[in-house]
Amino acid sequence: MDIRIALAGNPNSGKTTLFNALTGSNQFVGNWPGVTVEKKEGRLKKHDHVIIMDLPGIYSLSPYTLEEVVARNYLIQDRPDAILNIIDGTNLERNLYLTTQLTELGIPVVVAVNMIDVVNKNGDKI
């Protein structure tokens, strides 16, 4: 039986970079929002029974943009087994709004703080 894990988070938070590392894929990564506008599926390296879904970057589950519609529909209709919420450590307040919405879906959520090197470089702490 397959395990389905969705990568969710704000635009430009590192979801696709993590997706590529986990799956061995080579999806395009850009340093601006809106690069991923559709969901991408891959299998975890050395664990073929784990499906990783790279969702478009979104700020909320309110379906105002195409990216939010794609991500929301997958999370609510397809209901993955777990959500890996990638958040940008340099802007926690903006990122945690989506985190709150994700936890309300009743799906297990793991929060991964990304860009911690930039946080440390700025002299900040989490």
For the regions a language model picked out, list residue spans one by one.
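Conserved C-terminal guanine-recognition region of P-loop GTPase G domains, centered on the G4
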Residues: 42-47, 70-126
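Conserved G1/Walker A P-loop phosphate-binding module
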Residues: 1-65, 78, 82
